[in-house]
Amino acid sequence: MSASPTAGQAGLSYRDAGVDIEAGDALVDRIKPFAKRTMREGVMAGIGGFGALFELSKKYQEPVLVSGTDGVGTKLKLAFQLNRHDTVGQDLVAMSVNDILVQGAEPLFFLDYFACGKLDVETAATVIKGIAHGCELAGCALIGGETAEMPSMYPDGEYDLAGFAVGAVEKKKIIDGSTITPGDVVLGLASSGAHSNGYSLVRKIIDVARPNLDADFHGQRLQDAIMAPTRIYVKPLLSLIETLPVKGMAHITGGGLTENVPRVLADNVTAVIQRDAWTLPPLFQWLQAEGRVADAEMHRVFNCGIGMVVIVAKEDAERAIRHLQAAGEAVWQIGEIRERAEGQAQTVVV
């Protein structure tokens, strides 16, 4: 071991290097009640251990685990600019649980990673409270996470987020799009806004248009519309899956309708989406007008008001719509599946 400091010299500490261990401990104490509210059957230990334990329910006969990981992207830059951190946690959860839901998986647990240059306990607690709220909406447990304070890695007041979700589905009930055939119906579930995608373009439009973000925008502030948290579709869609055969689903994230729907389609079919089947929400009308964004670019970047696509047989479409509406979802029949012509795109918006 090296020599101790000489008389009159103060030894360096981790705090001198920019890491506040006490702040980290205080944060753990703050977030434990939030995590506790998310606990569900299967969780075997509370937050704070080296590893999180989860026992898979015996209700599964041939369980397949489904995992997903994601972040919030540059929507965080707006959170920093507006000093509002209460919704990005739900965004983080939604991006992963909606992804694994597409294959029919029930989200079981979630872990988060919060990284910053200097830990602000109040900000971090607000973010993680939002993560816990998202987990409650999804019915999964916030079973663990990591808070990394890394001096000089991030500017003061900024942080980054990553999330990881694990779910389970019966092997025979995996939804993979393999049963989709021409004549099937494409349903669209309403988004709550831009969700967590396209925000580099959103921020560019704001930079160019320089709007008053506190101005009234259809009954709310413009910033509220822009920062609305990503909708979590888990509970209504798990209920639908138990009610009727769902052939395919697509979470409309980066790439919009035209790049996400093809991910669940076989090569021999195409989805034809009718753009007049739903009304483009005011936020997207504003973004398109202020940014002079072409229709094709809108459909390739934004969800344009459709956060989740569900594909069912034609004879099940009306029943599916009624079921989802009863669960509180706004849903439209937005298109159909057709046989794909040679050279045709797998999803076209007409």
Curated annotation (Swiss-Prot):
Q: Read off the HAMAP family from this record.
A: AIRS
Q: Which CDD domains match?
A: PurM (cd02196)
Name the pathway it acts in. Purine metabolism; IMP biosynthesis via de novo pathway; 5-amino-1-(5-phospho-D-ribosyl)imidazole from N(2)-formyl-N(1)-(5-phospho-D-ribosyl)glycinamide: step 2/2
Transmembrane annotation, as ranges: none
Swiss-Prot/TrEMBL keywords: ATP-binding, Cytoplasm, Ligase, Nucleotide-binding, Purine biosynthesis
Look up and give the organism this protein is from. Answer: Cupriavidus metallidurans (strain ATCC 43123 / DSM 2839 / NBRC 102507 / CH34)
Its name, as the record gives it, is Phosphoribosylformylglycinamidine cyclo-ligase
Q: Which GO terms describe its biological process?
A: 'de novo' IMP biosynthetic process; adenine biosynthetic process
Q: What is its main location?
A: cytoplasm
Instruction: Tell me the gene name.
Output: purM
Q: State the EC number(s).
A: 6.3.3.1
